[in-house]
């Protein structure tokens, strides 16, 4: 067990809450003490949902542990059914209630409720939130759609002549990063291709919609962390293939279109939608100083991290210097992607390890979660959020998808703008000492005579006795600066005047200038970097 102030994922019952809240007429009864009743805060404050999540808690207290907590759970189930009248019910235990082993599934079955009851066995001390969401969605699909599954070996019936191909969108949940906007974007894209979206699940789906998932021709998996397990079950029992391409970025969206056209049985030369993304042209037309070769560190859930690395390198010209995820279930995929970019994958759920890696790599842009936003702010590095977990500002009122062609536009804006936002500050810093633009200068329209120039402070008279002391100090400094021949120089120290000169270099190339100068000094065995060293390095690498 680890004490921390931040976690990338909650316990698995939080994932179950995300699925239950996304569904329309399903209720979740959670065996939990008072301290675990925080779902209202997650969904109403952070996601700003206009309704409370469909979760009922038993809220047992310490004094109840000496009595019959199982009876408390049965009472809570009965009351939840009578009050909310759901068409299906999920039952499970929180991480704390799991310790008392009351078996919520067996207790709910004993009530013989007239609706399907889905028992959730979520090992809170071995698994986490995304796994809990995936397992919950899988169990819901298996319980509700299972009775309609054909007998094993039954061939899938052909689509009726003239009927439009149809599919399901699987994976979006409550509290997901831009899930609602992604659903709207991909639904519109599929409709323009002539493909009907039959059901979106779990977001906005009813129990009856889940039961009829097998009627679609194929499934589109938007978020493998949540939907891949359920999609695999539907493929085995209903013969429904599912997509493997995640449509994040222009190239991936085009590959996604080719894949769905093949699954839908439509010709490969079907015209693409008219509203293509502007980001490819923007990426080519924007000053290459802002984009080409920018060092970027990426961390998030596996789906968004892998997609972000691909977009960063193939569509924006960035250089990936770090790639990682907190999703241990998809660690192999992230490691394979990291090998492609020549970096070592960072698989961890400890934000301190992530912060140490960012500080070590000195990237020029960080793409990550809410925590990476805080890390980048502390380290003074531009940042954009690409993945859950996120805070309230990443549930915007505007339309802001991550997927599809419009999602590519959003990615370009949100990734490139942080790199450009510091230009004004840099210009102010450059001209702060100028006679015309210093802080004490009058407004330009008032004329230079409006404010008298500040009086210069008188220089202290140097006494003759100080001269030898100054000379001795300079000699000692020179002796310290000159290293012994046997001591190799690893990292040279920056002289104050050289550090000041370095700050005059525009921030978007300052990091490269620093690295080149330190490399130049190390190759020549210089212990101290002076202004002359800085300009010698510039001339050397300029050639």
From Swiss-Prot:
What EC designation does it have? Answer: 1.3.7.7
The function of this protein is: Component of the dark-operative protochlorophyllide reductase (DPOR) that uses Mg-ATP and reduced ferredoxin to reduce ring D of protochlorophyllide (Pchlide) to form chlorophyllide a (Chlide). This reaction is light-independent. The NB-protein (BchN-BchB) is the catalytic component of the complex.
Q: Where does [4Fe-4S] cluster bind?
A: 36
Q: Where is the active site?
A: 287 (proton donor)
Q: Any idea what this protein is called? A: Light-independent protochlorophyllide reductase subunit B
Query: Is Nucleotide-binding included in the keywords of this UniProt record?
Result: yes
Give the UniProt family note. Answer: Belongs to the ChlB/BchB/BchZ family.
Gene3D superfamilies (UniProt xref): 1.20.89.20, Nitrogenase molybdenum iron protein domain (3.40.50.1980), Proto-chlorophyllide reductase 57 kD subunit B (1.10.8.550)
Alphabetical list of InterPro entries matching this protein: ChlB/BchB/BchZ, LI-POR_suB-like_C, Nase/OxRdtase_comp1, P-CP_red_C, Protochl_reductB, Protochlorophyllide_Rdtase
Q: What does the record give as cofactor?
A: [4Fe-4S] cluster
Which positions does UniProt annotate for substrate binding? 422-423
Q: Which GO terms describe its molecular function?
A: 4 iron, 4 sulfur cluster binding; ATP binding; metal ion binding; oxidoreductase activity, acting on iron-sulfur proteins as donors; oxidoreductase activity, acting on the CH-CH group of donors, iron-sulfur protein as acceptor
Instruction: State which pathway it belongs to.
Output: Porphyrin-containing compound metabolism; bacteriochlorophyll biosynthesis (light-independent)
Q: What is the catalytic activity of this protein? A: chlorophyllide a + oxidized 2[4Fe-4S]-[ferredoxin] + 2 ADP + 2 phosphate = protochlorophyllide a + reduced 2[4Fe-4S]-[ferredoxin] + 2 ATP + 2 H2O
* Oligomer status and interactors: Protochlorophyllide reductase is composed of three subunits; BchL, BchN and BchB. Forms a heterotetramer of two BchB and two BchN subunits.
* GO terms of biological process kind: light-independent bacteriochlorophyll biosynthetic process; photosynthesis, dark reaction
């Amino acid at each position: 067990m680890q004490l921390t102030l931040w976690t990338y994922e909650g316990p698995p019952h939080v994932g179950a809450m995300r699925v239950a809240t996304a569904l329309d007429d399903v209720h979740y009864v959670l065996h939990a003490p008072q301290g675990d009743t925080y779902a209202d805060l997650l969904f109403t404050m952070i996601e700003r949902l206009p309704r409370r999540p469909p979760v009922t808690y038993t809220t047992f207290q310490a004094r109840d542990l000496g009595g019959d907590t199982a009876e408390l759970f049965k009472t809570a189930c009965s009351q939840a059914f009578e009050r909310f009248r759901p068409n299906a019910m999920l039952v499970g235990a929180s991480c704390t209630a799991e310790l008392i082993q009351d078996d919520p599934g067996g207790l709910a079955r004993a009530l013989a409720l007239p609706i399907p009851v889905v028992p959730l066995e979520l090992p809170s001390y071995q698994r986490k939130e995304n796994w809990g969401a995936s397992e919950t969605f899988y169990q819901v699909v298996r319980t509700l759609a299972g009775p309609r599954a054909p007998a094993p070996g039954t061939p899938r019936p052909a689509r009726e002549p003239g009927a439009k191909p149809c599919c399901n969108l699987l994976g979006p949940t409550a509290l997901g990063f831009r899930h609602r906007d992604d659903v709207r974007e991909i639904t519109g894209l599929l409709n323009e291709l002539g493909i009907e979206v039959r059901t979106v699940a779990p977001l906005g789906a009813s129990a009856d919609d889940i039961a009829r998932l097998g009627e679609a021709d194929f499934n589109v998996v938007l978020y493998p962390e949540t939907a891949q397990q359920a999609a695999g079950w539907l493929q085995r029992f209903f013969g429904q293939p599912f997509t493997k391409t995640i449509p994040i970025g222009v190239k991936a969206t085009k590959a996604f279109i080719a894949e769905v056209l093949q699954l839908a049985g439509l010709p490969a030369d079907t015209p693409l939608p008219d509203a293509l993304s502007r980001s490819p042209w923007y990426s080519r037309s924007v000053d290459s100083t802002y984009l080409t070769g920018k060092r970027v560190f990426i961390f998030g859930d596996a789906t968004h991290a892998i997609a972000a690395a691909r977009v960063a390198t193939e569509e924006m010209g960035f250089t990936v210097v770090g790639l990682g995820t907190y999703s241990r279930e998809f660690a192999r995929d992230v490691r394979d992607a990291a090998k492609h970019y020549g970096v070592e994958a960072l698989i961890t759920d400890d934000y301190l390890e992530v912060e140490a890696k960012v500080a070590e790599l000195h990237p020029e842009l960080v793409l990550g979660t809410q925590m990476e936003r805080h890390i980048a702010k502390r380290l003074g590095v531009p940042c954009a959020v690409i993945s859950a977990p996120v805070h309230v500002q990443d549930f915007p009122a505007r339309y802001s998808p991550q997927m599809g062609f419009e999602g590519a536009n959003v990615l370009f804006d949100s990734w490139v703008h942080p790199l450009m936002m510091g230009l004004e500050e840099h210009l102010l810093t450059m001209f702060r000492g100028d006679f015309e633009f210093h802080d004490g200068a009058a407004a330009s329209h008032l004329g230079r005579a409006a404010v008298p120039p500040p009086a210069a402070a008188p220089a202290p008279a140097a006494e003759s006795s100080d001269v030898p002391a100054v000379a001795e100090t300079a000699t000692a400094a020179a002796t310290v600066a000159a290293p012994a021949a046997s001591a190799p120089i690893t990292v040279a120290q920056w002289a104050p005047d050289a550090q000041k000169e370095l700050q005059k270099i525009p921030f978007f190339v300052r990091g490269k200038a620093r690295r080149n100068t330190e490399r130049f000094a190390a190759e020549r065995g210089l212990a101290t970097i002076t202004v002359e060293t800085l300009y010698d390095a510039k001339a050397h690498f300029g050639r």
